[in-house]
Amino acid sequence: SSAASDVYKRQRLYNKILPEVVSKFSPGTFYWPSSPFSRHGAPSKENIGDRHFWDVWGGEKSIDTYLTARSRFFSEYGFQSFPDIETIKRYAPNKSDWNIYSEVMMSHQRAGINANKKIETYLIDEFGKPHDFQSFLYMNQLLQGDAIKMAIEAHRRDMPFCMGTLFWQHNDCWPVASWSSRDYYGRWKAQHYFVRDAFRDILVSPCLKAGNLDIYVVSDRLNKAHSQLKISFMKFSGEVVASFEKDVVIESNSSKKYFSVDLEELLKDLDTRNIFVFLELITDEGDTYSNVHFFNRQKDLDYPTVTIHKEIKIIEGGYELSLISEKFARGVYVSLPGNNCVLSNNFMDLLPKKLVRLNVYTCLLYTSPSPRDTER
């Protein structure tokens, strides 16, 4: 039959012709015919071959499902968000369309008629209900970033069982709500900043297990890294509840647990809704890696109202922006009119009384008619 002939041609192309071509012109190069693929049994299983994992998003399972999913190589998984408001203004210039269920917003959705509802359901479950359209966009981007960051960290901690993780997707071919980490116009979503850090050569990563907080360090370096590990349990106000320091030697090309603490004993009589953990690893060469962990869903955390102090200094190509807050500030977002700029960092967690600097590259001129401080 025609169908059987097509299958034969495809199998011959991928399983005979292409591997022979690769072997001829690039001897020694490993050949993998497709994705997902397994040389033994069905593809997309957790213990053989590579896996496309869509239980989260596609299967509508909770985001923390990423923590327990396993694969030798995650070759596809993702979570959707809307693009930046300035991108949306290009295809929805009328504020009357600024509703995720408007015709124009539904039309600019990569995953069909149910996808916007799916985004909203996940968002309300994790963050609560936004008070307006732009808050929805901002919180949705944080949610996407948190979800994919969680997945990448879990995959890297599972090294060497899992030796690869590729999120879907990097960019868009039209302005749309999608799984991308950069939108059609190249504007970075929160996810792009988060995965950049999650893929650094060294990752310090927390993991809750059996009532303990385990601290893993994952290294892709080919040499050992003599380092100092710092763990701080803090209230959002800045009060330190407990802290630990430990000199560690990070093994090359490895994932290993370097610290563990019993949370029931440590946090008894404390309200975990206003507590977070700050992790910091400093190598002898001065390289710094950090992470933040919360004990509740974002909507259940008791975030304080904060005042963010800012200073701006002119640098080549733009400005250096310094930010500091007396209290913890989650996901601080910086934008300029039209958002025609490149930022070295964004969607940042500001630790109490800790200065953060970022570069803002833009051709816009700076004037200062507004107060230096921002309340949020």
Which functions belong to the PLM regions below?
Residues 2-38:
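Active-site neighborhood of glycoside hydrolase catalytic domains
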Residues 1-4, 8, 366-376:
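Single conserved hydrophobic/aromatic residue that forms the stacking wall/gate
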Residues 307-348:
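C-terminal accessory/binding modules appended to enzymatic or scaffolding proteins
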Residues 215-220, 321-325, 360:
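Aromatic/hydrophobic beta-strand junction motif of beta-rich domains
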Residues 213-249, 258, 276-278, 329-337:
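Beta-strand-rich binding/interaction modules
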Residues 239-270, 340-364:
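Intrinsically disordered, low-complexity Pro/Gly/Ser/Thr-rich segments with frequent PxxP/GP/PP motifs
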Residues 22-23, 33-35, 55-223:
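Substrate-binding clefts and catalytic carboxylate motifs of secreted carbohydrate-active enzymes
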Residues 264-302, 364-368:
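Terminal connector regions
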